[in-house]
């Protein structure tokens, strides 16, 4: 009888990536098949996020539901992973003794052994350590699920912003070697992936080892990824302004595979608040980056993160944030009311902004960015946009859907053979969360470039010793 696995995922794209790797890993080692129905599962895994307020209580509420399933089926294995697991550790079992496995973001690769241990003697397992690169070494080969894919290139963060738990729950920055990343992407491209999204908590801080022992830069990596045959679009998230160096901006100037859309969190437009947040950059420095980016790529659109109601934020501070929003003309944002995360320096600050004031500021900020986003969308009306067709539209099974370079969802009439390919679509209608259009050109009519293969890149950049022996070892 087929064994079933149910994974519930909360949080960022990194968590989504981790959950997909858990599923692949347990399929490869134990033959577990994913199910959307928790009641059918032999193993239940909760992949948690600790960014938002009351994250812990949300976890225990979900576990309370699963407890009822465990009472009906004592052999059911329940595991809790992700950032709340890393933060809370044994405390989870103190409140929910029926949980069998507690694992952190860096130990998910040990899940097969943890499950075997629980199956063997029913003893609970807790492993929230930080074994650095070992996680990536032990994950199964990637499996494509459509024309787009996420690829994790690094973990952790060294920035220690005062409001953020990531350095404490995912550890400090660890970069994957460039060869490992390129090999994974080449495998995905061979399975039909056309667009990759490079992931990291601070992705542009990537400093991975190259095949010759040197340390690569993020700009170097972007160019190598762009050279992989079949990869026509590259995205990355999430970036930090302090690591957004001029060599990355140059990649926007000369690498068309890098999309004209960037998510670059700023959090506030007030230098005083940025300093309290530990962001290590000013609003002016942020705007300087955007100015350089738009000089290199005039059509680039920018999204950002904002926290409103940070301890000490005055009306003047908020007005500076609104001015920054207008100056940069952000296309979209992820914006939140400040919520103190336990164990962070900001949790010890006096939360002196009234709750109603926080809500009002958030409403004003989101309304302004929604207006700017709609203005950007209206500019696209009547233009022809290149769309990567991802599948059937959520709005109608008779239509297809895909995304523009600037991350707009576009719905249009098409044929199933277009899925996984590019089409040019004339934009005919604009809606708050999507666009509509009609196909004017298929991929066969585009004459797309023939990409350079990884082998040719390596041959061109090959380094040899005095005997003519190359340093590269495939």
UniProtKB/Swiss-Prot annotation:
<dbReference type="GO" id="GO:0051539">
    <property type="term" value="F:4 iron, 4 sulfur cluster binding"/>
</dbReference>
<dbReference type="GO" id="GO:0035600">
    <property type="term" value="P:tRNA methylthiolation"/>
</dbReference>
<keyword id="KW-0808">Transferase</keyword>
<dbReference type="InterPro" id="IPR002792">
    <property type="entry name" value="TRAM_dom"/>
</dbReference>
<dbReference type="GO" id="GO:0005829">
    <property type="term" value="C:cytosol"/>
</dbReference>
<keyword id="KW-0479">Metal-binding</keyword>
<dbReference type="GO" id="GO:0046872">
    <property type="term" value="F:metal ion binding"/>
</dbReference>
<keyword id="KW-0004">4Fe-4S</keyword>
<feature type="binding site">
    <location>
        <position position="161"/>
    </location>
    <ligand>
        <name>[4Fe-4S] cluster 2</name>
    </ligand>
</feature>
<dbReference type="GO" id="GO:0030488">
    <property type="term" value="P:tRNA methylation"/>
</dbReference>
<comment type="subunit">
    <text>Monomer.</text>
</comment>
<feature type="binding site">
    <location>
        <position position="83"/>
    </location>
    <ligand>
        <name>[4Fe-4S] cluster 1</name>
    </ligand>
</feature>
<dbReference type="GO" id="GO:0035597">
    <property type="term" value="F:N6-isopentenyladenosine methylthiotransferase activity"/>
</dbReference>
<dbReference type="InterPro" id="IPR020612">
    <property type="entry name" value="Methylthiotransferase_CS"/>
</dbReference>
<dbReference type="InterPro" id="IPR038135">
    <property type="entry name" value="Methylthiotransferase_N_sf"/>
</dbReference>
<feature type="domain" description="MTTase N-terminal">
    <location>
        <begin position="3"/>
        <end position="120"/>
    </location>
</feature>
<dbReference type="InterPro" id="IPR023404">
    <property type="entry name" value="rSAM_horseshoe"/>
</dbReference>
<feature type="binding site">
    <location>
        <position position="157"/>
    </location>
    <ligand>
        <name>[4Fe-4S] cluster 2</name>
    </ligand>
</feature>
<dbReference type="InterPro" id="IPR006638">
    <property type="entry name" value="Elp3/MiaA/NifB-like_rSAM"/>
</dbReference>
<feature type="domain" description="TRAM">
    <location>
        <begin position="378"/>
        <end position="441"/>
    </location>
</feature>
<protein>
    <recommendedName>
        <fullName>tRNA-2-methylthio-N(6)-dimethylallyladenosine synthase</fullName>
        <ecNumber>2.8.4.3</ecNumber>
    </recommendedName>
</protein>
<comment type="similarity">
    <text>Belongs to the methylthiotransferase family. MiaB subfamily.</text>
</comment>
<keyword id="KW-0963">Cytoplasm</keyword>
<keyword id="KW-0411">Iron-sulfur</keyword>
<keyword id="KW-0819">tRNA processing</keyword>
<dbReference type="InterPro" id="IPR006463">
    <property type="entry name" value="MiaB_methiolase"/>
</dbReference>
<dbReference type="Pfam" id="PF04055">
    <property type="entry name" value="Radical_SAM"/>
</dbReference>
<dbReference type="Pfam" id="PF01938">
    <property type="entry name" value="TRAM"/>
</dbReference>
<dbReference type="InterPro" id="IPR007197">
    <property type="entry name" value="rSAM"/>
</dbReference>
<dbReference type="InterPro" id="IPR013848">
    <property type="entry name" value="Methylthiotransferase_N"/>
</dbReference>
<feature type="binding site">
    <location>
        <position position="164"/>
    </location>
    <ligand>
        <name>[4Fe-4S] cluster 2</name>
    </ligand>
</feature>
<feature type="binding site">
    <location>
        <position position="49"/>
    </location>
    <ligand>
        <name>[4Fe-4S] cluster 1</name>
    </ligand>
</feature>
<feature type="domain" description="Radical SAM core">
    <location>
        <begin position="143"/>
        <end position="375"/>
    </location>
</feature>
<keyword id="KW-0949">S-adenosyl-L-methionine</keyword>
<dbReference type="InterPro" id="IPR005839">
    <property type="entry name" value="Methylthiotransferase"/>
</dbReference>
<dbReference type="Pfam" id="PF00919">
    <property type="entry name" value="UPF0004"/>
</dbReference>
<keyword id="KW-0408">Iron</keyword>
<feature type="binding site">
    <location>
        <position position="12"/>
    </location>
    <ligand>
        <name>[4Fe-4S] cluster 1</name>
    </ligand>
</feature>
<comment type="function">
    <text>Catalyzes the methylthiolation of N6-(dimethylallyl)adenosine (i(6)A), leading to the formation of 2-methylthio-N6-(dimethylallyl)adenosine (ms(2)i(6)A) at position 37 in tRNAs that read codons beginning with uridine.</text>
</comment>
């Amino acid at each position: 009888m087929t064994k079933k696995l149910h994974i519930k995922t909360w949080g960022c794209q990194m968590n989504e990536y981790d959950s997909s790797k858990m599923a692949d890993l347990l399929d490869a080692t134990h033959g577990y098949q994913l199910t959307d129905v928790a009641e059918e599962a032999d193993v239940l895994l909760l992949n948690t996020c600790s960014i938002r307020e009351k994250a812990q209580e949300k976890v225990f509420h979900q576990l309370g539901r699963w407890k009822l399933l465990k009472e009906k089926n004592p052999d059911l294995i329940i595991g809790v992973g992700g950032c709340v697991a890393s933060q809370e550790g044994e405390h989870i079992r103190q409140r929910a003794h029926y949980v069998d496995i507690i694992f952190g973001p860096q130990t998910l690769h040990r899940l097969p052994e943890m499950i075997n241990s629980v199956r063997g003697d029913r003893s609970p397992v807790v492993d929230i350590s930080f074994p650095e690169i070992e996680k990536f070494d032990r994950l199964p080969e990637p499996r494509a699920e459509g024309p787009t894919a996420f690829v994790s290139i690094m973990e952790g963060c060294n920035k220690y912003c005062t409001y953020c738990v990531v350095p404490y729950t995912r550890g400090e920055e660890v970069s994957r070697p460039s060869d490992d990343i390129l090999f994974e992407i080449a495998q995905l491209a061979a399975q039909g992936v056309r667009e990759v999204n490079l992931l990291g908590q601070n992705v542009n801080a990537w400093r991975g080892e190259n095949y010759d022992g040197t340390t690569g830069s993020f700009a170097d990596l972007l160019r190598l990824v762009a050279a992989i045959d079949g990869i026509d679009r590259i995205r990355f998230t999430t970036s930090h302004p302090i690591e957004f160096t001029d060599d990355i901006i140059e990649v926007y100037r000369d690498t068309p595979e890098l999309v004209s859309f960037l998510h670059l969190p700023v959090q506030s437009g007030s230098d005083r608040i940025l300093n309290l947040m530990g962001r290590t950059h000013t609003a002016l420095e942020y705007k300087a980056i955007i100015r350089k980016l738009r000089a290199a790529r005039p059509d680039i659109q920018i999204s950002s993160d904002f926290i409103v109601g940070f301890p000490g934020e005055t009306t003047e501070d908020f007005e500076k944030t609104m001015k920054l929003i207008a100056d940069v003309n952000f296309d979209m944002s992820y914006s939140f009311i400040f919520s103190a995360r336990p164990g962070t320096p900001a949790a010890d600050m006096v939360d002196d902004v009234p709750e109603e004031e926080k809500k009002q500021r958030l409403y004003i900020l989101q309304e302004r960015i929604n207006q700017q986003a709609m203005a950007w969308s209206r500019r696209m009306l009547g233009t022809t946009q290149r769309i990567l067709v991802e599948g059937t539209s959520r709005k109608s099974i008779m239509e297809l859907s895909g995304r523009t370079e600037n991350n707009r969802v576009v719905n249009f009439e098409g044929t199933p053979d277009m899925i996984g390919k590019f089409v040019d679509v004339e934009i005919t209608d604009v809606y708050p969360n999507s666009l509509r259009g009609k196909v004017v050109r298929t991929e066969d009519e585009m004459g797309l470039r023939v990409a350079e293969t990884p082998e040719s890149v390596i041959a061109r950049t090959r380094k040899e010793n005095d005997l003519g022996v190359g340093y590269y070892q495939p």
